[in-house]
Amino acid sequence: MAHPSGSGGTSFAPTPTHPHHLSRETSRDELEMAESLRLLNQTHDHQKPRAEATSQEQQQQQQQQQQQQQQQQQQQQQQHAQEDPRSEIYHSLEDAVPIADGPPTPSTAASLQIPNMNYETPNASITGQVCSNCKTTQTPLWRRSPAGETVCNACGLYMKARNQSRPVNLKRNTQTQPTMSVQQSPTPGSTDGSRTCAGNVAGSPRVATYVAADQMAAGTCPGGGRCNGTGGQQGCSGCPAFNNRVSKTAKFALAQANAAPGENRGGSDAASSTSAASASTSAIPACQNCGTTITPLWRRDDAGHIICNACGLYYKLHGTHRPVAMKKQEIKRRKRIVPAADTSSQAPSSVANYSPPQRPSQTPAFEHSVSPDPSTALESREAYTPEPPRGPIAVDFTHYYSNSSVTSNPVALTPTVQPSAPSPRKRSRSATLDPEEPVNPLPHRPNAISAILNPSQTEVDANIDPSLSVPLRTSGGTSPNFTLSPEEKAAKRERLKREAEAMRLELERRQKELEELEND
């Protein structure tokens, strides 16, 4: 326990807890430690009033610098308003960042350290783009919700994948901002001067390259599917390149407005005025590879540098950086609206859109049966009912044992069916033809495909056994017995003889096989 020593210092010698214990002598190390602690306390007590005085002086200097910057900004705005009444152009209703039309102010390249920004403050509306779901003002791509509200890229992708709003607790706390270097035009009076290639600027990863926004006049977009990100046309309000440019410009201006002035407290007045002039100039991001400031989407390469959409896709596809010679001053917007189709483009009909005509109530005569073109016959066949799968011909045995009248005329008993008599069997396509049209096509006509696809009634009936044909019905009485004509009897007799002979030969062959098996 520390207690005052005899020399006036503080001694760290332990105090005896009991009176009967003897106290030991203080060592040399303990005395040196106590002396150094006393000197340190005295030095700290002397520095306290000095630090308070220094802090008051710094606060006064900061207030003076803020007043000077405000006066300089007001003077510059008054000068621009006197020179040109159209000196300030606002890209949107919420955007209050002035972009000058005149030539850029000559200044040297300066670097600006962006401090931490609080996006929940009311000043965040100056960016012009706020997510309606998570209230963020930072996103690589602004999207539209199904309800038409502006949402950030994360909320839009979440809604597209899950069909529900993204929870607010998933929002990342991105309060720290990287260092951004500002490069401004070195030559005064050059409105369309070439941009400084950002690829030649040495910088560490996560360093965004910014260039002066005065290098390209605002409101000079040509329109018509070509975009340079400056606006001025009717369709620029929904252009991603224009919205991205406005958002980045406003974000940089907001960072300058929230930046604590007087970071370099030990600098001279000339250095302070130079930094204030450079800080008042609006800036926009530039591609680290080609130096362009026009892109619908900012990307990052493997090293963490900010690059444009074209350079990012080229690097992703080819594995190398995009050549600077491929850089274009304008980008082509994708046309998402399908133009109206012309009448000439509708002339060729597509096979996928072909719909066959409806079949009429009565099947017409097959007019294309005499056409020598096979394709014509195939097209005409699509209008009829497709044929059933090939197989045994269907025969109706309902009236096989029915009674029929006996007539003395043998010709009337032939199996030929008259056109006027209704056929009890299923009707084929040839039965629906007109009676005036010949059933069999002429032999000299080269329409073999039509004959195969549409067989005649005679060819169909030739495959049926004559004994199974339906007898004709007459107006006379009915006969209890069914008789055949002599020709049919002779044909049946010959058929039975052939079958008997075949059976006899088969029986002899089987008998020989049995004898061979018995002999073995």
From Swiss-Prot:
Where would I find the GATA-type zinc fingers in this protein? 131-155, 287-311
Biased region (Basic and acidic residues) positions are 22-31, 486-495
Any one GO molecular function term: RNA polymerase II cis-regulatory region sequence-specific DNA binding
Task: Quote the biased-composition stretches of kind Polar residues, using this chain's numbering.
Answer: 168-194, 342-364, 406-418, 475-484
UniProt feature, compositional bias: Low complexity: 58-79
The record's subcellular locations are: Nucleus
Loss of function: phenotype: Impairs the repression of siderophore biosynthesis and utilization genes in the presence of abundant iron and thus produces siderophores even under iron-replete conditions.
Q: Which residues form a coiled coil?
A: 486-520
Q: What is known of its domains?
A: The conserved cystein-rich region (CRR) localized between the zinc fingers is also involved in DNA-binding and transcription repressor activity.
Protein task: GATA-type transcription repressor that regulates iron- acquisition genes through specific binding the GATA sequence elements of target promoters. SRE1 targets repressed under iron-replete conditions include genes encoding a number of key iron-regulated factors such as those involved in siderophore biosynthesis NPS6, SIDA2 and ABC6, as well as the high-affinity iron permease FTR1, the catalase CAT1, and the superoxide dismutase SOD1 encoding genes.
Q: Under which name does UniProt file this protein?
A: GATA-type transcription factor SRE1
Name the species this protein comes from: Cochliobolus heterostrophus (strain C4 / ATCC 48331 / race T)
